[in-house]
Amino acid sequence: CDGVFSSELSDDLTSENIEISRLADVGDLHWAQNYYGVLEEKGQNPVNRPLAAFNTAMASDGALINIKGEVKRPILILGVHNNPAEAVLHHLIKVDKDCSVTLLESGPFATRVNTVMEVFLEQGASFEHVRAQGRDHDRWAATHIFSDIKEKAKFKSFTLTANGILTRNECVLTLSGNNCAALVAGASVGDGKKFHHDDTIFI
């Protein structure tokens, strides 16, 4: 709620074939240590992304998700915005070999939000991402998705953006294996004079 995790609004984070942790709770010995910030750092070349670097250094929370087997239902990250607030969130998703997951994101999260999502897809893995941004006239958002897609892995992401004063969505994909695939799509709808939207994709 307003960029702060709410246990009251969340389901139990334990589930079969899924390991979910919060960035705010983990220590140095967590599996994410070897992955956190790796793709963001690589994504600074050939174009600097200072907001992404700021996020990696300053993120207060985020979801650390490791998919280890069959997942029967999607994972939802829901943002609830009640009061003026700022949020810096960093998510990390690792999908193991031949595993698949669908991740849903919905809600404005905060008045000003900076998010990074790093997605590691092992051989034959599949990741489907559907995101709804809005409907919030006062939102300022900078989002970044970085993904490493290995052999025969599939990455799909769709974003629907409604309103917002300023929205910038970046997607940086590395196709690092044969016969891998990536599909990125989106739609934007703005109502009002103060509306600026920008999508950028690097492969």
Give the label of every model feature segment.
Residues 8, 12-19, 23-26, 31-203:
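Conserved beta-strand/loop scaffold segments within soluble protein domains that form the structured core
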